């Protein structure tokens, strides 16, 4: 009886144990960490840089890849929920609620993340988004045009992935005792970085360290609602972490 109760506590489980976090990490991100690490290691070889970049681009734009990831993540999410149900995790403690403030927080957070992304892109020499010659091509209506050009699968996958990642990082990884929160925060940064290394070390650090900490402190001490982060992350998956790219008309 004691063994069964240790697995499935009588009272709802508010604080996850270290083994809960490790098991859920492997379930939700183990495969993606392996894939990302493999692509990153391949990119370090000069002879494979071009092929890796081409493969990454093709995967990102391929509907079949969206469908494959969608199915896999849905399956892993289902297994994770089953595990949490067995552990009698207290889902009610997660603040997921719709309010009018969501319509403010989502675009505001996306804009902050997007502008920072544009600064990083410009300073790294990838592309100068702050070139004055781009000003005439800025059109807010471009947001609608770019959204309308997305496929239903791309939108569906972005929504799923936004929930998938932030449910883990901001939801589950904050379900720990206060004395462990800083250690778990460091752990969350490492995990965020580890499955984004396929984008290059610079962007893996930006996403994992800068964005990860920004999301955490904003959620924990200001917003206190997971929904805006689910939706904002979905927008970033749809359009990338760039505000100016979204606003600029690129058609000639």
What role is predicted for each listed range?
Residues 1-13:
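Short, Lys/Arg-rich, polar N-terminal cytosolic tail immediately upstream
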Residues 5, 80-98, 228, 232:
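Cytoplasmic juxtamembrane interface segments
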Residues 14-32, 105-110, 185-188:
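Alpha-helical transmembrane segments
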Residues 17-88:
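Alpha-helical transmembrane segments in multi-pass membrane proteins
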Residues 27-35, 72-76, 109-117, 121, ...:
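Alpha-helical transmembrane segments of multipass membrane proteins
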Residues 37-48, 86-90, 119, 123-131, ...:
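Membrane-interface elements of multi-pass transporters and channels
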Residues 44-62, 89-161, 250-252:
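Juxtamembrane helix-loop-helix connectors linking adjacent transmembrane helices
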Residues 115, 146-252:
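Transmembrane helix-loop-helix hairpins at the membrane interface
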């Amino acid at each position: 009886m004691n063994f069964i109760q240790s697995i499935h506590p009588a009272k709802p489980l508010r604080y996850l144990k270290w083994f809960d976090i490790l098991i859920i990490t492997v379930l939700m991100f183990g495969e993606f960490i392996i894939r990302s690490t493999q692509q990153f290691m391949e990119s370090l070889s000069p002879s494979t840089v071009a092929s890796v970049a081409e493969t990454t681009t093709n995967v990102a734009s391929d509907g079949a890849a969206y469908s494959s990831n969608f199915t896999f993540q849905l399956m892993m999410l289902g297994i994770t929920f089953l595990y949490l149900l067995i552990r009698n995790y207290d889902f009610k403690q997660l603040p997921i609620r719709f309010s009018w403030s969501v319509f403010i927080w989502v675009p505001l957070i996306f804009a902050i993340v997007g502008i920072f992304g544009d600064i990083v892109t410009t300073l790294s020499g990838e592309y100068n988004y702050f070139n004055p010659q781009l000003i005439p091509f800025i059109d807010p209506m471009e947001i609608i045009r770019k959204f309308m050009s997305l496929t239903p699968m791309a939108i569906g996958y972005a929504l799923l992935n936004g929930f998938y990642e932030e449910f883990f990082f901001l939801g589950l990884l904050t379900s720990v005792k206060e004395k462990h929160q800083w250690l778990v925060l460091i752990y969350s940064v490492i995990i965020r970085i580890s499955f984004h290394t396929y984008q290059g070390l610079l962007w893996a650090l930006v996403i994992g360290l800068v964005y990860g900490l920004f999301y955490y402190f904003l959620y924990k001490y200001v917003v206190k609602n997971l929904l805006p982060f689910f939706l904002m992350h979905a927008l970033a998956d749809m359009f990338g972490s760039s505000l100016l790219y979204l606003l600029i008309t690129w058609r000639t």
